[in-house]
């Protein structure tokens, strides 16, 4: 096959490429090069058409499975999930052990909402690679990670824990596997959280913990700061900043210009963080600040909190589909003065965006109470409860203090106070309460609860329900300590 040289303008180039593909004169490398170029220019439809045409006339080519793979990925990006599934199946018909296609076929099933089919797809691949090469082992572990992730999201915690442990036994250096495994153990109150085997050491397990998980595991502030630093270094790494000149702080006071403040979060919706922030966004003094919201979460429909937030800010940006670099470019082009990270190290965080330093001032606020341990978060907004003055040495950020760090929406509907009977509580008992998630309950805390309840006859502990099996596990431990589970 021939390579493509200069073949004219952009529109004529596309038509010439189609003709070359039809006559089997378009080299495989050129298919990828031009399709990727079209995609980067926002011409994804033309990229899809180029792949489709080439495949129609070159299906016998020894590299056809790779073109089917790229074609499928592009269709998935355009939300043509059935087409993506068919293309990925075609790739696997040519090469049944094509690891990336095995993984992405499961992802396409997941996108279609067929979670059992996604899990079965990955399981079949895992079973077919029990005797395999080092390269295929990597894809086998990846498939196991996806199974664990989907099961975790579906609340199948014990099943997810089992498959992730098997993945760790195969590749203990894959920290993302251990990160999910330890978090799942916490949600089930399985103590001790950390275990080891002949293949996985205790040190590897601890090193795989995310800062969020570690915050529920250890109260050692130096340990938490060190883990945040290491996590940031490995997760964000050394980004290419050559096209991101360092932003300088602009003096705007007295110039008539408004300060541009940007909030980046996946939780600007019906979510605990969204509930906290919505009135705060409404209360900004719009004569002195211009508010930009950068939403990096999944699309939501008919979301009352997001609707209210969109009305409160000056500019709303959906950046969920953008790469970290593209999102950082968007923020930089908006000339944001102060960029606020509302996620920290919580779920769906886009920490790499901040690594590009798209604003001169970057602040950690509201979503994550720990230190980011990063070189690009300069400040953290906190109060005396979140960061006592004596604890500031354990934060890489300069701590800026306000009276209360927890925004409250005063317009939020408050239900009528229920009676004890309606809440399922005894009329005359003293009620201790804990409405934290299960992952925040430690073995030490549980021992203290047992001591308190035993020393306080007639009292009860009112808890937030978690996973059904975790509830049963805690109740069984209370009963074993002589405390009535009812």
Where in this protein do the model-derived segments appear?
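Glycosyltransferase donor-sugar binding loop
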Residues: 295-300, 460-475
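Feature representing long, continuous alpha-helical segments
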Residues: 275, 446-447, 472, 476
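Charged, low-complexity intrinsically disordered terminal segments
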Residues: 425-427, 436-440, 444, 464
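Short hydrophobic signal-anchor/transmembrane segments that target glycosyltransferases
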Residues: 280-287, 443-457
């Amino acid at each position: 096959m021939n390579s493509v040289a200069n073949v004219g303008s952009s529109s004529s180039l596309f038509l010439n490429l189609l003709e070359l593909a039809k006559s089997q004169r378009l080299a495989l490398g050129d298919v990828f090069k031009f399709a990727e170029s079209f995609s980067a220019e926002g011409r994804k439809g033309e990229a899809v058409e180029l792949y489709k045409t080439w495949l129609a006339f070159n299906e016998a080519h020894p590299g056809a499975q790779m073109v089917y793979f790229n074609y499928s990925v592009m269709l998935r990006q355009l939300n043509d999930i059935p087409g993506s599934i068919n293309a990925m199946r075609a790739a696997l018909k040519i090469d049944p052990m094509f690891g990336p296609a095995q993984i992405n076929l499961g992802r396409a099933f997941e996108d279609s909402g067929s979670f059992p089919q996604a899990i079965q797809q990955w399981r079949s691949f895992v079973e077919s690679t029990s005797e395999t090469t080092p390269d295929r082992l990597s894809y086998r572990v990846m498939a196991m990670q996806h199974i664990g992730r989907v099961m975790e999201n579906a609340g199948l915690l014990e099943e997810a824990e089992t498959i992730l442990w098997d993945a760790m036994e195969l590749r203990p250096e894959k920290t993302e596997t251990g990160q999910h495994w330890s978090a799942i153990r916490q949600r089930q109150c399985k103590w001790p959280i950390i275990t080891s085997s002949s293949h996985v050491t205790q040190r590897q397990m601890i090193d795989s913990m995310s800062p969020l998980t570690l915050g529920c595991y250890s109260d050692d502030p130096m340990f938490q700061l060190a883990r945040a630093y290491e996590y940031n270094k490995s997760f964000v790494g050394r980004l290419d900043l050559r096209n991101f000149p360092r932003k300088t702080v602009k003096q705007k006071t007295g110039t008539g210009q408004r300060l541009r403040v940007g909030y980046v979060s996946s939780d600007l919706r019906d979510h605990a963080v969204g509930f906290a922030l919505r009135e705060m966004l409404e209360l900004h003094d719009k004569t002195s600040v211009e508010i930009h919201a950068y939403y990096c979460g999944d699309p939501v429909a008919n979301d009352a909190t997001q609707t209210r937030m969109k009305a409160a800010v000056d500019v709303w940006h959906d950046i969920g589909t953008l790469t970290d670099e593209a999102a950082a470019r968007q923020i930089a082009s908006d000339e944001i003065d102060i960029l606020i990270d509302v996620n920290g190290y919580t779920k769906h965080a886009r920490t790499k965006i901040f690594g590009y330093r798209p604003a001169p001032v970057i602040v950690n606020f509201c979503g994550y109470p720990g230190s980011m341990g990063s070189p690009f978060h300069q400040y953290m907004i906190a109060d005396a409860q979140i960061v006592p003055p004596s604890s500031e040495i354990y934060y890489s950020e300069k701590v800026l203090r306000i009276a209360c760090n927890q925004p409250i929406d005063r317009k939020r509907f408050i239900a009528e106070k229920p009676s004890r009977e309606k809440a399922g509580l005894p009329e005359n008992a003293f009620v201790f309460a804990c409405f934290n998630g299960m992952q925040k309950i430690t073995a030490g805390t549980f021992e203290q609860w047992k001591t308190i309840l035993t020393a306080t006859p007639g009292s009860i502990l009112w808890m937030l329900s978690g996973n059904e099996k975790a509830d049963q596990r805690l109740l069984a431990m209370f009963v074993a300590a002589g405390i009535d589970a009812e």
